[in-house]
A protein has these predicted regions:
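Patatin-like phospholipase
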Residues: 1-45, 53-286
Length: 286
């Protein structure tokens, strides 16, 4: 069994679209047990990269920060009001949407805290920051760090296949980090770390002879992508990974249909259960 202890020195946050709000609940609860400073690095994939960047730049998970992040987790803030008439154009562009709206959302999130993220690189963060994307040119994951512009790295890590146009950076093609890195802990060479995954349950869809006939091409591609990443994740995740979920909440859910406080509370409770199972809550009482 892998030995874990508080405080954690490294943090990994996995992808999961709208489910990223679960990261917030777990981190808010963790902040009651240790300072959210990770000297060995913050690693993020997709939406986990967004929250990891927020954290690595020293922005607080206080009430104001939680409120701002909650507001950003509406699906329309990422993709807008999708006009499905543009699906035909997506076959030539390899995606329905540019990432302009996504970029504007990130800029607004940081500007509200006094940071012009447009001028920042990953190396400007208050702690080591690593953002993971899927490099289609090389056919393997790429870990961005150092002098890579924050916005470029985030767009590469969050470019969901079929939804967003693939991103070109340094002459190479990138899509969502989840494709090649469904379990971020595989890229973190530390024992004293915590990884949080949003892949405990990814879909309730059953693809059968009957259901496949009525599925849209977009739903079909999305569900296959979901199954691939979940199966890969289940094969490679380690004992250092906390897996979170909330009933009915998926990567493409409308967050307005949920009680966000309930989601945050469950994530915090699941973190405590995880720490308790590892014997870490006892350490806090000594």
């Amino acid at each position: 069994m892998i030995r874990m202890s508080l405080p954690f020195r490294a943090l990994g946050l996995g992808g999961g679209g709208v489910k990223g709000i679960l990261h917030m609940g777990a981190l808010y609860e963790l902040s009651k047990k240790q300072e959210l400073v990770f000297p060995d690095g913050v690693y993020g994939v997709s939406v986990g990269a967004v929250i990891g960047t927020y954290l690595a730049f020293g922005l607080p998970f206080d009430d104001e920060g939680i409120l701002k992040l909650k507001q950003q987790f509406k699906l329309t803030n990422f993709v807008g009001n999708v006009d499905f008439n543009c699906i035909s154009h997506s076959f030539s562009l390899k995606g329905m949407l540019t990432m302009d709206l996504f970029e504007a959302m990130i800029v607004d999130l940081f500007e509200s805290r006094g940071i012009d993220i447009r001028t920042k690189t990953l190396g400007d963060a208050n702690m080591p920051l690593f953002i993971i994307s899927s490099n289609l040119t090389k056919g393997k994951p790429t870990i961005f760090s150092g002098n890579v512009p924050v916005l470029d790295a985030l767009k590469c890590s969050c470019a969901i296949p079929g939804i967003f146009v693939p991103q070109i950076l340094y002459g190479q093609v990138y899509i969502d980090g989840d494709m090649f890195c469904p379990s971020v802990d595989k890229f973190m060479p530390f024992d004293n770390m915590l990884c949080i995954s949003l892949k405990k349950k990814m879909t309730d869809i059953k693809i059968t002879e009957q259901t496949i006939e009525n599925m849209s091409p977009l739903s079909y591609i999305h569900d296959i992508y979901t199954m691939i990443t979940q199966n890969f994740h289940n094969q490679v995740k380690s004992e250092k990974t906390l897996c979170l979920n909330f009933p009915g909440l998926s990567s493409m859910s409308d967050i307005d249909e949920f009680n966000v406080d309930d989601i945050l509370t469950k994530a915090g409770s699941d973190l405590n259960s995880f720490l308790g199972a590892k014997g870490l809550l006892q350490e806090l009482t000594k």
